[in-house]
Amino acid sequence: IQQMELLEDRYVTNLPGKVTFGVSSQHYTFTENAFVELVKRFGQERYAFYYNETGTHQILDDVKNRVCDLGILYLSHENEIVMRKVIEENHLVFTELFSAKPHVFLQKDHPLASKKVVSVHDLAPYPRLNFVQGEYESVYFSEELFSSIPVDKEIRVNDRGAIVNFMLGLNAYTISSGIFPKYLNGENIISVPLAENETMHIGYVLNENQELSELGKSYLEELRKYAPDNP
């Protein structure tokens, strides 16, 4: 569709070509924020940008089929062997941007909110929130660390806004990178470090032999600003 629009611009409407760029990402707030900054910098009078928050396997498909320019996901000790194999089989390449220690997202009045560190055992009484992965509901494609640990209460969602509502209304939690700007939900959502020994290696996937465009390089610059060691 995007290619058809570009051809129409060139040969039918005789207008200047649109600036184009696309990203498929796991459900991270910071990837969306970085995309906003990219559009502010490079969005001219005419552009066609694409931002898709989706499941892990769909990200790989989008990059492989060139639906988007690059994909954002994480590797960990838990999923790395299988994920690297799948990435290689799809003729893709993963490059790390930065690493982050896992945190638990909770609402500010949650019974665990005052703890300096939370363990998986502490979380057992509360509903766990996981993003839906469609037909690829496997620990290796999960967006949440430790999703292989059985729990009594679990809610699967496909919308980041729903996750926030369930945190606020049900004392539910999710496990992610801890990168969550406060202005997105006031002071209502907080992140608490998880005691478990694991690291999220957040990075991007490209097709083999694909060179980053200037927009791609600029987007990665924006993403790096959210690295946990940045002030």
Where are these regions (language model features)?
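Short amphipathic alpha-helical coupling segments at ligand-binding clamshell hinges
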Residues: A34, E211-L223
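Hydrophobic hinge/microswitch elements
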Residues: K64-V67, Q133-I190
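Secondary-structure junction motif
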Residues: T31-A34, E80, S119-V120, A124-S148
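Beta-alpha-beta core module
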Residues: E89-T95, A100, G161-E211
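Central regulatory/effector-binding core of bacterial HTH transcription factors
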Residues: P16-V82
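Flexible hinge/capping segments at coil-to-helix
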Residues: V86-R128
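Short helix-loop hinge/linker segments at domain boundaries
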Residues: I1-S24, V39-Q44, E89-V93, S114
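Short helix-loop capping/hinge motifs at secondary-structure junctions, enriched
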Residues: D109-V118, E196-E198, N209-G216
